[in-house]
Amino acid sequence: MRLSDFQDGLASALLPPPGASVPPPAWLDALLAQPGFAVYRNTVAKGCIDALQANYPAVHALVGTDWLRAAAHAFVHKHPPTDGRLMAYGAGFAEFLEGFGPAANLPYLGAVARLDRCWTESHLAADAPALQAAWLAQQAPEALALLRLQPHPAARWQWCAEHPAYTLWQCQRDGLPWDADQPWQGEGALLTRPHDAVQWAPLPHAGCALLDACAAGATFEDAAAQALQADPTADLPALVALLLRSGALRAPETSLN
C-alpha cells in the first residue's frame, strides 16, 4: 500500500463528508473498530471547529458561539484542512456562509468573514519592504506613469458594494457599539502589516480599484485611470498618500539599491 493511499483513507475516515455513501477502505476496518478512534476523530473535528471560531472572531461576535460552531461543523466536513497550521485554516468559509441556509437572513455575513480572512492572510504573509513616499517623489512624471507598482505581500483589501462591511467588522474586532445612524451603504477596507501587527483602515472604492489594477500588473497611469473610473470624484494624491502611509505598496527592487 502506498503511503498516500493510507493518508487519504485515514483523512476520509477522520472527517467524512455529511451523507457520505462510500464506505471507508476495508483495510481501515480494524482501526475504525478501536474505541479510541471515535475519540480521536471527535478531537480532530473539534480542533478544526475551534480554529474556525478563533480565525473568524468578527463573525463569531455577530452570530454567537452556538450558531458559529454549527456552521463550522458543516464546513469542516466539506472542507477539511490542507495545511498543518490551523491558524491558516478557513479559506472559503466566507463563500460557504453565503450559501449556508441559516445565514440567508444575514446577507452581510460573507463580507464580514472575508475581512476576518484578510486579517489572517495579512498576519501570515511574507515580510517585504514597503514603498516609501520619498522614492516615489524622486521619479520623473513620465517614469512614474509607466511604473508597475505591486501591492505589499501583507496588503489585503475588499470592496463590498451592498453593505457597510468594514464598519460591521471593525465594531466586532474593536468591541465598539453599532451606531444606529450608520448609513447602510457599500464600504471598502484595507488591511496591512507595516510592522509587527496587522492594521486596518477604511478604503474607498477608488482605492480598491487602484490596488486591483496594481495587482493585475497595470502601469501606474492605467491603475489611476481605473481608480477614477470606479469613482470620478476620487482624490488620487490623497489616495496614494493613504496607501503609502499604510505600507500597502511594495518597494521596487530599484528603490532598495
Where are these regions (language model features)?
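Low-complexity, glycine/alanine/valine/leucine- and proline-rich hydrophobic stretches
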Residues: 153-216
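Long, charge-rich, low-complexity alpha-helical segments
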Residues: 1-140, 196, 201-257
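Short, functional C-terminal segments
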Residues: 110, 117-176
